[in-house]
Amino acid sequence: MLAALAAASEPPAHVARWRAQVDWEAAQAETVALLSAYLQVDTRNPPGMEEVGASFLGARLDAEGIPWALLPHSEGRASLVARLNATNPTAGPLCLVSHLDVVGWEDERWPADRGPLSGAIVEGSIWGRGALDMKGMGALELQTMILLKRLQVPLSRDVVLLALADEEVANVGAREAVDRYWDQIGCSHAINEGGLGVKDAIFDGESVHGVSVAEKGILWVELIATGRAGHGSTPYPGEAPDRLRDAMVAIDRMRARPVFDETMLDLLDAIGRTHGGATGAVLRSPFLVRTLARKKLMNEPATRAILTDTIHLTGVYGAVAPNVVPSEARAMYDCRLRPGTTPGAMLERLREATAHVDGVRFEVISAAESSASPTDDPLFRALVRYAVEGRPAAAAGPLLSVGYTDSMDLRRKGVRAYGYVPFEVTAEDAETMHGHGERVPVSEVGSGLERLFSVVVDVAAAP
């Protein structure tokens, strides 16, 4: 309901006033060129070496007279912070967050004329690793800072640009920003990655924009089985591979219970209002969602992952040769935990499920609890409003992200962090994140810039 009310509300007058002063065609062209060049900077992680990416952004900031600083954490690796100051601040600083690093790739899987470091503009899209995750957002945020500075928009709160290192591997950049450099950041609110707009997400001709207000916790574990070693020609009881198999079967039989919380129900309500009719009425009714729509939602992998704690087998290890029985065999699990489930509670469930199998134990690789920010906040309402402004076939609402981002560390400081990349793309384009042929439509660079600029002016500019 909150999302629907936010989407229906009119933008403040000062937003329209400042938007009218922007040449949006020129701003899109400038941002497209910026993103194309940014994608050509190699910051794949590992090894990272994000300082070259930070310096690239810093050169653009220098050209506009916006002060910035490196936040180093190891040789060749650094984050960047820049700031536009409010004259008489009436609210805490707003932070525009992105990460400098990108995941690796397989060169042979990309088209020859639009490779991962090309920044090529082909078939109406900008191609390159990071176009969606998340150099595209970084380019929008930098261009928003540039527009604020050029137009001399009077600010009611500081606006901070924070481009972080090492999001894709260990989140060291975010942790160090919070633990070592917070005096240079000190924000109360943040816009980061998380949700985005997807065309035809549920119904043909209708798009859904999820604004992430929470992220699932994690428990990464290894299941380790030990037992008798020997020759493959003669099976014996108590061998490690057999014990591992039995424990894995027990884990596979664990049943997840769906949770229809306020976040999911509010998003479904927004989708239902947009779609209308009998189906829309079902989506707007919590009772009908739990009864009539439950089966369909649980059968879709994407919504099932939101509704439940997930236990995902991601690897099995131990074999030496076909005729050798190893004394140890391992399986790796990625567990993603809804708010309300702690890593300790999930670990206990795993132990209980496998208690009947001798010679098995769990080792924790990494663990973190879920984190969340409230929907009753002006920044969340602004993100929802401009995601769908002027487009009756678009719905926006809160989202529980199944992955985790640097927002998890920001929330440790009490920051209200929301995840929304203001692009609207096809499901096919969205699936290129971390995949082959990552790209973003040129038109969405312009639309996304206007959405983000509108949000920032709404919540950070003096009326």
Describe every region a protein language model picked out:
Residues E10-A131, L148-R157:
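Acidic/His- and Gly-rich active-site-bordering loop/insert found
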Residues Q28, W110-P111, V153-P154, S212-I218, ...:
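Short glycine/proline-enriched loop/turn "hinge" motifs that connect secondary-structure elements
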Residues S125-I126, L132-G210:
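Acidic/histidine-rich catalytic neighborhood of metal-dependent amide-processing enzymes
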Residues R44-P46, E75, N88-P89, L100-G104, ...:
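Solvent-exposed loop/turn segments at secondary-structure junctions
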Residues M1-A8:
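Hydrophobic h-region of N-terminal signal peptides that target proteins for export
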Residues E176, R180, R228, S233-R257:
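A short core secondary-structure module
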Residues P89-A91, W105, V198-K199, R257-V320, ...:
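An extended, acidic, His-containing surface patch that forms the Zn2+-binding/catalytic region
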Residues S9, R77, A91, R114, ...:
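Short, solvent-exposed loop/turn segments at the edges of secondary structure
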